[in-house]
């Protein structure tokens, strides 16, 4: 389980990896990128934001897919319903080379993947209750954090 994000990113050699991303069984896009971030609203202000993804209000019921350093000019984040099922497939590299990818949940490497492997990502049936320690609104907190940017 992940609270913030699930990241697939290249492992070892510094080169882009090809990923096929499916939503509810239909191909959404093929990304040539350093990786792909699948983020919850809670995780949208972390790695997703650093990779150019949108900030999402924490109570929104959505999932964000953001490519990391995509090798294309027309790729941007995609915002989906939290009910959607996302599959990410690691594709073979140039000349059929076996690619190695790290699958990370909330920043910790959980497993290695290779060309042909797929991971299925969906919202868990379990829910978590989060404690809000500040009385400040989300918008005020975001405004304060973004001041220097």
Regions found by a protein language model. Give the residues of each.
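Catalytic phosphate-donor-binding core of small-molecule kinases
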Residues: 1-37, 45-149
């Amino acid at each position: 389980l992940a609270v913030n994000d699930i990241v697939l990113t290249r492992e070892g050699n510094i080169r882009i990896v090809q990923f096929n991303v499916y939503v509810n069984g239909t191909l959404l896009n093929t990304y040539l990128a350093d990786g792909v971030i699948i983020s919850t609203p809670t995780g949208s202000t972390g790695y997703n934001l650093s990779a150019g993804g949108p900030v999402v209000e924490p109570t929104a019921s959505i999932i964000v897919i953001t490519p990391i350093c995509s090798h294309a000019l027309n790729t941007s984040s995609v915002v989906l319903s939290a009910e959607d099922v996302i599959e990410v497939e690691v594709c073979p590299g140039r000349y059929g080379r076996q690619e190695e990818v790290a699958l990370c949940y909330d920043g910790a490497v959980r497993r290695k993947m290779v060309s042909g492997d797929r991971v299925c990502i969906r919202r868990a049936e379990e829910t978590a209750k989060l404690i809000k320690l500040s009385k400040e609104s989300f918008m005020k907190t975001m405004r304060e954090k973004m001041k220097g940017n």
